[in-house]
Amino acid sequence: MWDNATTMMVVEGIFVTLYMTLATTFMGYVLGLPMGIALVITAPKGLRPNKIIYKVLDVVVNVVRSFPFLILLIVIQPLTRIIVGKSYGPTATIVPLTLSAAPFIARMVESSLLEVDHGVIEAAQSMGANLWTIIWKVMIGEAKTSLIVNVTI
């Protein structure tokens, strides 16, 4: 059906797409996971309420999520050039893809962590667990299934 050159272009396109998708997913979680955790922790009813940090993160997540990708691609082109060295190509596209994916991931992480029963968190606090133990062992441990399901989205 296809000649050899067309087949090679399709195969190359598949690998480039996989590269961009996997790199964006990884980098999106590197940025989005801490943002989602911070949103839960600093929320008004969180473990360490902080109105300023919560509001700033909330606004950043909402604003970036509402930006159309092509506009974001153009707006952060100088940043992409600084990070990658050029503003075109698959590697350069990962930067705006990551910056647009991270807020979505942050909201999914926030949603997953908010599903954790508050009684479990209170039990950990009453046993003397520190903040990091509560975050990593209790909250993320309890929300692990939901977080893994969210990776597929």
Predicted regions and their residues:
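Short membrane-interfacial helix/loop motifs at transmembrane-helix boundaries
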Residues: 1-5
